[in-house]
Design a protein with these regions (language model features):
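Extended amphipathic alpha-helical scaffolds
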Residues: 156-160
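Internal, active-site/partner-interface "lid" segment
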Residues: 91-107, 116-135
Length: 166
């Protein structure tokens, strides 16, 4: 179900919202418990803030995941007149709104996004490049002790120099 929802969301983005700075997709048939996972996948894939909206019993519910350059909670406060409820922090949020307000919600978030194309470029922070000879099975086992990886505990990026691909 998550894969189907992710593919449906990507199809919407590719068809209608590719130029948007904040992705807002409405998946009425998707279960609300999957919205955050799908929003996270959209954020990773497009390197843009993403909000996935689903049809709830009483209102449309949404879950958002953001990038460092976009404070999602603050931006939701700017459109709070359209929302029934919302909460969150800089990188994630939950919300509810009436279905009739979806287009205006999406339009205003994009109009006031304050993001540039530079903000959508993935950033990788490398503390120290590592000689390839340091990568051993033992190191891989040691790194696995740091799991699970995710927000706030990212997979350690590794950088090598002087390598050639043939």
């Amino acid at each position: 179900m998550t894969e189907q929802g992710t593919e449906a969301a990507k199809l919407q983005v590719e068809s209608w919202y590719q130029k948007d700075k904040v992705l807002g997709v409405f998946l009425p048939e998707c279960h609300e418990s999957l919205a955050g996972i799908i929003a996270g996948r959209l954020r990773e894939y497009y390197q843009k803030p993403a909000i996935v909206l689903t049809r709830g019993e009483e209102a449309v519910k949404g879950s958002g995941r953001s990038i460092d350059e976009y404070h999602m909670f603050k931006k939701l406060t700017e459109v709070s007149d359209l929302l029934l409820k919302f909460g969150g922090h800089p990188l994630a949020a939950g919300l509810s709104l009436e279905e009739k307000n979806i287009d205006e919600f999406r339009r205003r978030l994009n109009e006031n996004a304050g993001l540039t194309e530079e903000d959508f470029k993935a950033k990788v922070w490398i503390d120290v490049p590592m000689p390839v000879g340091y990568v051993t099975e033992h190191l891989v086992r040691e790194l696995s002790c740091l799991e699970p990886f995710g927000q706030g505990n990212e997979k350690p990026p590794v950088s090598y120099t002087h390598l050639r691909a043939h």
